[in-house]
């Protein structure tokens, strides 16, 4: 599964407010998150990631901790579920 590309968050839940409004996953497993209007702190600012299974990815969060997430890709919609059960979605921009 390939996460490479630019993504825009399309979910607006209370639990996902600390995840970036936009994120770009690079081929060399790095990512860069971008804050949206009114976002003060984002967990995914910049760092590394590793796909560890067909539906699991480990992402380096702002504290440098490596955190596992479940994910799925359906068409151009990428869905993540964090360890607290928060589900949030991104739409592929490019």
What annotation goes with each model-predicted range?
Residues 13-14, 22, 56-94:
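Beta-sheet ligand-binding and adhesion/scaffold domains
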Residues 1-6:
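N-terminal helix-cap/turn-to-beta initiation motif at the start of protein domains
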Residues 8-12:
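The phosphoinositide-binding surface of pleckstrin homology
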Residues 15-57:
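N-terminal glycine/threonine-rich, aromatic-flanked beta-hairpin/loop signature
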């Amino acid at each position: 599964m390939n996460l490479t590309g630019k993504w825009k968050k399309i979910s607006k839940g209370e639990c996902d407010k600390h995840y970036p409004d936009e994120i770009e996953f690079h081929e060399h497993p790095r990512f860069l998150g971008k804050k949206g209007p009114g976002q003060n702190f984002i967990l995914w600012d910049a760092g590394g990631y590793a796909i560890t299974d067909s539906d699991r990815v480990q992402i380096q969060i702002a504290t440098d901790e490596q955190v596992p997430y479940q994910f799925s890709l359906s068409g151009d919609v990428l869905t993540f579920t964090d360890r607290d059960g928060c589900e949030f979605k991104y739409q592929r921009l490019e």
